[in-house]
Amino acid sequence: MKYLLDTDHISILQWRTGPAFTTLTGRMAPHPRTDLAFSIISLHEQTRGCHAYLQRARTAREVVHGYSLLMQVLRNFTVAPVLSFDDAAATVFAALVAQRLRVRTMDLRIAAIALARGLVVLTRNASDFGQVPGLQIEDWTV
């Protein structure tokens, strides 16, 4: 395993269309699937989005659509290993928090998983992830 996809790259894959999707899938094509992983944090973010949609749903059609979105998220997360936020990541996360970085908590958790496992984060969010010392990031949508 070499690369950890941030939630933004996962979302682009879910769109299945557009220039960012085409570029990203082209960059992924030469790599074996074993090189790529998702994080439990990204799964959390996406299921939280589905939950928020369902909380706002007012019609049966919206509820059905919300659960359809949730099913799609579950299917999408079966195509690559989902890495846990384990003790090693928690230790790295605590050290990063102590540095008072101005990075959102979920992004910092993803960064901690990557640092604990020596992975490169694939993301378009260089403004946040670029602040994390020692973290390697790449944007495969450009």
Where are these regions (language model features)?
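Acidic, PIN/NYN-like endoribonuclease modules and their adjacent C-terminal/linker elements
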Residues: 1-2, 111, 115-142
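Short, well-structured N-terminal submotif of metal-dependent ribonuclease cores
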Residues: 1-42, 52-71
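Histidine- and aromatic-rich ligand-binding microenvironments
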Residues: 5-6, 39, 103-104, 125, ...
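A generic structural signal for short hydrophobic patches within well-formed alpha-helices
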Residues: 10, 43-46, 90, 129
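Short, flexible helix/strand-to-coil boundary loops that buttress conserved ligand/catalytic motifs
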Residues: 14-17, 50, 97, 133, ...
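Active-site neighborhoods of divalent-metal-dependent phosphate/nucleic-acid chemistry enzymes
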Residues: 48-54, 75-122
